[in-house]
């Protein structure tokens, strides 16, 4: 069985995904830690000692922004891989889970047409009564075109490359 891929930006997400990984066949799974997680090297050693995951640390701050123009998704993918030092291969994983699809890693997954699962904490907090991000995104004039073609980025589960929202 293929391992799952878990992408984490916070200690809470690491805890949730470590619990998932330890209860799911296919171990060791792969956990990508954003360098935004406090003390990622130290944490990576502790996580790997559990046997549930192998850890890859990705420093998203190396990616300066977006790419536009012809073949933008392909060019953005290649630039991310070169600058951040990690390459995603969809066929290597069973499930791909991310908590923040509006992050650099989330945009990279969209560029890779990843078919990811958006985990619960970000989506639920975005839909609170005073949150306008999702409704504003859906009201944008180019929303339907982005959903139909997959060109450009959509967040909070609206991307056609998001397979499911938990």
Roles of regions detected by a PLM:
Residues 159:
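Extended interaction regions within the primary functional domain
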């Amino acid at each position: 069985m293929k391992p799952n891929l878990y992408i984490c930006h916070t200690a809470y997400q690491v805890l949730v995904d470590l619990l998932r990984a330890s209860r799911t066949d296919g171990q060791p799974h792969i956990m990508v830690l954003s360098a935004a997680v406090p003390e990622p090297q130290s944490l990576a050693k502790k996580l790997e000692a559990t046997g549930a995951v192998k850890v890859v640390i990705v420093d998203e701050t190396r990616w300066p922004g977006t790419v536009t123009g012809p073949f933008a998704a392909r060019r953005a993918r290649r630039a991310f891989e070169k600058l951040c030092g990690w390459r995603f291969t969809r066929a290597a994983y069973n499930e791909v889970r991310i908590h923040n699809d509006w992050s650099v890693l989330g945009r990279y997954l969209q560029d890779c047409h990843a078919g990811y699962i958006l985990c619960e904490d970000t989506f639920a907090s975005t839909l609170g009564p005073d949150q306008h991000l999702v409704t504003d995104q859906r009201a944008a004039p180019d929303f339907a075109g982005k959903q139909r073609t997959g060109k450009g980025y959509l967040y909070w589960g609206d991307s056609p490359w998001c397979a499911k929202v938990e």
